[in-house]
Amino acid sequence: MTTTSNVLYASQARPWLKYYDPNYIDQPMPECSAFDFVRQQNKNRLSETALEYYGRKFTYADFIVNTKKTAAAFRAAGVQKGDIITVVSVMTPEVIYAFYAADRIGATLNLVDPRYSADGIHEYIEEVDSHLLICLNVVYDRCRQAARRTHVERVIVLSPADSLPLPLAIGYKISNPDRNKYDSNALMWKQFIANGQDASTAGEPYDPDHACVVVHTGGTTGSPKGVMLTDRNFNALAQQFAAWHALFRKGQTLMNVMPPFIAYGYACGVHMPLALGLKVVIIPNLDPAKLGSLLLKHKPEHMFGVPSHYQQMAADPKLKNKDLSFIRNYAAGGDAISIGAEKTVNDFLAAHNVEYPLAKGYGMTEVSSAATIAA
């Protein structure tokens, strides 16, 4: 007779473990911050490229130095352990430094979609009671309005040109002149960094309960919610991908086309590849028509995107008859993909010498992770 006392549930039996490498079963979690995990994993690779932004390359040594400078600048601006800094931006090197710098000093980033209205941004600032706001210059006016009647004391302004190679930066500023009228509490990013030159870069002691970021759900089951994710969320994800060592190897390239304000974009598009020693090519605002050209230029082994990215790839005439055997793991999430569209993409990949089909992830912001199913 079967009773509840002698039933072995799947969660206890864990039959899926037979497919796992024994070396990774019950592997202990890294007891360190997300920043320290990246640093430890690349301590012997400091001269290798960590980030690439429109042709400008930043080594892992550059990444560490710039993160520490940003941490010092936060301290000089009055940021303390437990504070939440709101960031309204697309993905840029500065946003990446800000994430790891805030994590280093025990603060938290609240990442907000720059397409939101002033009222929407205001709501997210109020939700976490930010005193410091970081925003792109192209959305400054909206953020200035959003910061009214909040506790925001200082606004740090980024330009997409801040990390561009000099010729591109000059060209960008000529074609996109900054016509904002800045309030007295606004400070440009480079001056913000300069203000921190005498402040401490030391990290706070590791706290396993510290939330390094607030991201927002997609609102699938109701209004979008702010979700606090810890260092453990990010490090666990990176460690899981490290177990997939047949596909992910140090020195490979991941092309980041996802925004920072969703867990998928930051966990899979930034922290995971950096923790695994990959180069992250930052594409802050992807033009779908240029996807094929970008793939041929950078030859990224890895990419995390949404289904429409891969449908665009399969239809791109620039990729016709091209050898794409460099592709190792292209994954789709964030939206549904029909059976027909998936077949079209997989047929395209197979016809272009790609060994593996499209990986589909079924994710959940609250756990900063996803499941994938193979038939």
Give the positions of each predicted feature.
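N-lobe entry segment of adenylate-forming
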Residues: 1-58, 62-77, 81, 149, ...
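Conserved AMP-binding/adenylate-forming
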Residues: 53-58, 70-116, 128, 137, ...
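Conserved AMP-binding A3 loop
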Residues: 59-61, 212-236
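Conserved structural elements of the adenylate-forming
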Residues: 64-69, 199, 208, 227-249, ...
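Structural core segment of the AMP-binding/adenylate-forming
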Residues: 77, 104-191
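Conserved pre-ATP/AMP-binding loop-to-beta segment of ANL
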Residues: 180-216, 223, 246-253
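Conserved AMP-binding/adenylation subdomain of ANL enzymes
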Residues: 235-253, 261-302, 312, 316
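Gly/Ser/Thr-rich phosphate-binding loop
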Residues: 301-305, 314-375
